[in-house]
A protein has these predicted regions:
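A short beta-strand-loop-beta hairpin characteristic of the jelly-roll/cupin
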Residues: 1, 95, 99-123, 161
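Conserved metal-binding segment of the jelly-roll/cupin
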Residues: 1-12, 114, 120-141, 150-152
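Conserved hydrophobic/aromatic positions in well-ordered beta-strands
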Residues: 7, 81-83, 102, 148
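A short, N-terminal "cap"/entry segment at the start of jelly-roll beta-barrel domains
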Residues: 16-81, 163-167
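Short glycine-/acidic-enriched loop or helix-start segments at secondary-structure transitions
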Residues: 18, 139, 159
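A short beta-loop-beta micro-motif enriched in histidine and acidic residues
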Residues: 72-79, 86-100, 116
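Non-heme Fe(II)/2-oxoglutarate
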Residues: 83, 153-158, 162-166
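Ligand-binding pocket scaffold of soluble enzyme catalytic domains
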Residues: 144-145
């Protein structure tokens, strides 16, 4: 069997900033969810079957619960997605108002460019792309790149200020 990685991301900084505490389990708008690896792989393969256009930012699966499905968030304030990039391809430079915190799952020969600076990837590293930074991801390797990204996108979604644009 393979090992496991526990990567924990919460909205605790937001709660602390506002002086709040997490709601009791019975009152929370968050559901426990489980996404089996086989289903994630199946969905990712389906995405790759769809032709990529110039207005496509990349290949991604967005994770959500039944109660958060309408906003496409995993929590009211957080968005979680598995992004992917085919071997030998580069993602078109873009920006958005939310921060992007990424866990590199598979990324040999991959890197990101953030505000003109190259950041090489390493396995299981966490990278941070600041809000509004122009960035792109590049796969110079021979395998599909996989990176799990959490963003404070829920806040921007509810305020209608996502600010996504190609650079």
């Amino acid at each position: 069997t393979e090992g496991a990685v526990l990567w924990v991301v919460t909205n605790e900084p937001l709660l602390a900033f506002e002086g709040f505490r997490a709601a009791a389990v019975e009152r929370t708008p968050i559901d426990a969810v489980h996404f089996p690896a086989a289903e994630i792989a199946r969905q990712l393969d389906r995405i790759y079957e769809v032709a990529k256009g110039d207005d496509t930012a990349g290949f991604a699966i967005i994770f959500s619960s039944a109660r958060q499905e309408g906003s496409r968030n995993i929590m009211p304030s957080l968005t979680l997605g598995l992004n992917s990039l085919p071997p030998g391809e580069s993602q078109r430079p873009h920006r958005h108002n939310s921060v992007a915190v990424a866990l590199v799952i598979q990324g040999e020969g991959c890197w990101s460019t953030v505000d003109g600076r190259r950041k090489d990837w390493s396995p299981w590293a966490t990278t941070v792309t600041p809000p509004t930074a122009v960035h792109s991801h590049h796969n110079g390797g021979t395998k599909r790149a996989l990176f799990l990204i959490v963003q404070d996108g829920g806040l921007y979604y509810h305020a209608r200020t996502m600010g996504f644009s190609f650079a």
